[in-house]
């Protein structure tokens, strides 16, 4: 006991790091390394060693940094690190839970009764048993030589700072090396995998809950800032809800780089959309994006027309339609194969999971990270919201370059393909790979429909921008005032389930949509806000919905004819 009391704060931090990093993560080690052992390679063995070391060193790095606040504050913060890590380890060990944004958001909910429901006697016993030893160490130790004190003491500054910096470098450098190695494997095989460092950070304590907590805090600050700075249509306008909307499911699929002129349903010579072509409840429009890059389009495609400035950076002025639906009583989940966190937080979604978190899920370890992983997330979301009035946002990777990485080998029907980034592909090879990716998009979209056929549901799809695939220009992102037309060509789809169409009003809306699609009426991103609200049956007596932009608005002449 005397040794524990007299131990330096640096030694105590390392001892705690061993306990948290190794003991509390042992269930994760077992699951991750168990799969490594089945097909062992030198790189997998090296990965195991790196991950073991990283969990210890990152915890040591954290605890030493926290001692910059002084001895008393360090004890409190270290106690919280131990307790939070012990609590998280219970769910990771016994329930195989991946601690991410959604878990943290659920824990931080203001509904304390709901949070209590997941805390039982076994959890309390585990928390006490796992935490008691490190807490005794923390509160018995004199905490001599905190980093704050050492930095203030001549002769100790360089050495103490060097140890902390070295720990950080020893975490970052090996993981970075393995990340580079994984990228080489991806380029050689055409298989797309999540960031190695991102998966590691989302898999182990304490980095998983710390990163999720940081993301949650940032989202709250960002949301609060946006609430104060952005115009809120839900407050500015009056929205009248439809009488039969409380059991409705809404899904919005955000596509990536897919062009309508490479889709069979729009007359393209190749049958790239065989499944969508069979959908009787689908209205498909030739659309035009508001910009040519993902980040810019996400700013302007979900707000009211004029809700984003027309400047190069597309400065936001208003909240988006998803935030408005949330304020109108919808629950919402967002699942993404990308990492546009600024946008995700602006949706006010109850739960957000992005590609690294999804890739870290036990059921997804070792799998290619493609859009179909979102289907499992969607199924869970539907199961957890059986009553409806629920919004699901799916942000896909769609047809983004490298096109060949966007689909499995079974979808490689047009060859030769563009295999690698540096392989100097011909235009024909790039088009073959691009068209294969569009066929996989077709499969993904109809898989979303399959989850909703027995529900009262409406699905919207719109790609964020188009793509250039020719000898002179490639990819996208050209400034919109000089971008070629193909970078603006995006498919925009509306699908309604049979139960949704059982309503005469909805059936009339859909008939109007089909009529407009058949005569090839062009549609725009900036019409999505009014269309989503209008197709759900919302009305606004004071201008909250621009009927000129509402695809589901039936002109008075047609209403009279219908009667």
Curated annotation (Swiss-Prot):
One of its GO terms (biological process) is lipid A biosynthetic process. Residues 1-9, 70-79, 139-159 are cytoplasmic. CDD domains: LptA. The keyword Transit peptide does not apply. The chain crosses the membrane at residues 10-30, 49-69, 80-100, 118-138, 160-180. It is an enzyme of class 2 (transferase). InterPro entries: Alkaline_phosphatase_core_sf (IPR017850), EptA-like_N (IPR012549), PEA_transferase (IPR040423), Sulfatase_N (IPR000917). Its cofactor is Ca(2+). One of its GO terms (cellular component) is plasma membrane. Its EC number is 2.7.8.42. Keywords: Cell inner membrane, Cell membrane, Lipid A biosynthesis, Lipid biosynthesis, Lipid metabolism, Lipopolysaccharide biosynthesis, Membrane, Transferase, Transmembrane, Transmembrane helix. Its main location: membrane. GO terms for molecular function: phosphatidylethanolamine:Kdo2-lipid A phosphoethanolamine transferase activity. The keyword Iron does not apply. It is found in: Cell inner membrane. Residues 31-48, 101-117, 181-563 are periplasmic. It catalyses: alpha-Kdo-(2->4)-alpha-Kdo-(2->6)-lipid A (E. coli) + a 1,2-diacyl-sn-glycero-3-phosphoethanolamine = 7-O-[2-aminoethoxy(hydroxy)phosphoryl]-alpha-Kdo-(2->4)-alpha-Kdo-(2->6)-lipid A + a 1,2-diacyl-sn-glycerol; alpha-Kdo-(2->4)-alpha-Kdo-(2->6)-lipid IVA (E. coli) + a 1,2-diacyl-sn-glycero-3-phosphoethanolamine = 7-O-[2-aminoethoxy(hydroxy)phosphoryl]-alpha-Kdo-(2->4)-alpha-Kdo-(2->6)-lipid IVA (E. coli) + a 1,2-diacyl-sn-glycerol. It is a multi-pass membrane protein. Pfam families: EptA_B_N, Sulfatase. SUPFAM superfamilies: Alkaline phosphatase-like. Belongs to the phosphoethanolamine transferase family. EptB subfamily. PANTHER family: INNER MEMBRANE PROTEIN, KDO(2)-LIPID A PHOSPHOETHANOLAMINE 7''-TRANSFERASE. Catalyzes the addition of a phosphoethanolamine (pEtN) moiety to the outer 3-deoxy-D-manno-octulosonic acid (Kdo) residue of a Kdo(2)-lipid A. Phosphatidylethanolamines with one unsaturated acyl group function as pEtN donors and the reaction releases diacylglycerol. This is Kdo(2)-lipid A phosphoethanolamine 7''-transferase.
């Amino acid at each position: 006991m005397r040794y524990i009391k007299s131990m330096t704060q640096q030694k105590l931090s390392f001892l705690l790091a061993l306990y948290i990093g190794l003991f509390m993560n042992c269930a994760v080690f077992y699951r991750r390394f168990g799969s490594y052992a089945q097909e062992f390679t030198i790189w997998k063995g090296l990965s195991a060693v790196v991950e073991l070391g990283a969990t210890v060193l990152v915890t040591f790095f954290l605890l030493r940094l926290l001692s910059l606040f002084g001895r008393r504050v360090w004890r409190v913060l270290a106690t919280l690190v131990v307790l939070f890590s012990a609590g998280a380890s219970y769910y990771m060990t016994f329930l195989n839970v991946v601690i991410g944004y959604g878990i943290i958001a659920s824990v931080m909910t203001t509904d304390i009764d709901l949070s209590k429901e997941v805390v039982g006697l076994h959890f309390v016993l585990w928390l006490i048993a796992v935490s008691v030893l490190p807490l005794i160490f923390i509160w018995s130790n004199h905490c001599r030589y905190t980093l704050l004190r050492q930095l203030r003491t001549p002769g100790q500054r360089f050495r103490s700072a060097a140890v902390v910096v070295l720990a950080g470098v020893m975490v970052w450098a090996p993981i970075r090396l393995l990340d580079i190695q994984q990228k080489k494997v991806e380029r050689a095989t055409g298989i797309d995998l999540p960031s190695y460092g991102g998966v590691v950070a989302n898999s182990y304590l304490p980095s998983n809950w710390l990163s999720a907590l940081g993301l949650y805090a940032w989202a709250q600050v960002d949301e609060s800032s946006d609430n104060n700075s952005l115009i809120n249509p839900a407050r500015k306008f009056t929205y009248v809800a439809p009488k039969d909307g409380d059991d409705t499911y809404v899904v919005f699929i955000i596509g990536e780089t897919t062009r309508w002129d490479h889709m069979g349903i729009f007359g393209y010579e190749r049958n790239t959309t065989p499944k969508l072509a069979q959908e009787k409840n689908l209205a498909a429009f030739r659309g035009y994006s508001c910009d040519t890059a993902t980040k810019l389009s996400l700013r302007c495609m979900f707000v009211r027309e004029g809700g984003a400035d027309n400047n190069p950076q597309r400065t936001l002025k208003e909240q988006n339609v998803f935030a408005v639906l949330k304020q109108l009583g919808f629950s919402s989940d967002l699942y993404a194969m990308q990492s546009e966190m600024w946008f995700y937080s602006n949706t006010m979604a109850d739960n957000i999971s992005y590609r690294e978190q999804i890739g870290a899920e036990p059921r997804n370890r070792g799998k290619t990270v493609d859009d179909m992983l979102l289907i499992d997330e969607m199924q869970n979301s539907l199961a957890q919201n059986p009553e409806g009035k629920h919004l699901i946002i799916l942000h896909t990777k769609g047809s983004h370059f490298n096109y060949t990485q966007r689909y499995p080998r079974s979808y490689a029907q047009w060859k030769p393909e563009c295999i690698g980034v540096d392989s100097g592909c011909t235009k024909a090879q790039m088009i073959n790979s691009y068209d294969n990716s569009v066929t996989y998009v077709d499969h993904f979209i109809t898989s979303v429909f399959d989850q909703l056929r027995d529900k009262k549901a409406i699905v919207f799809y719109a790609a964020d921008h188009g793509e250039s695939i020719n000898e002179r220009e490639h990819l996208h992102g050209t400034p919109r005032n000089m971008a070629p037309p193909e970078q603006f060509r995006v498919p925009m789809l509306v699908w309604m389930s049979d139960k949704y169409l059982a309503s005469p009003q909805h059936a009339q809306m859909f008939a109007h949509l089909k009529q407009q699609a058949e005569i090839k009426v062009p549609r725009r991103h900036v019409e999505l806000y009014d269309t989503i609200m209008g197709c759900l049956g919302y009305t606004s007596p004071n201008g909250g919905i621009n009927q000129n932009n509402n695809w589901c608005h039936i002109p008075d002449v047609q209403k009279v004819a219908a009667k």
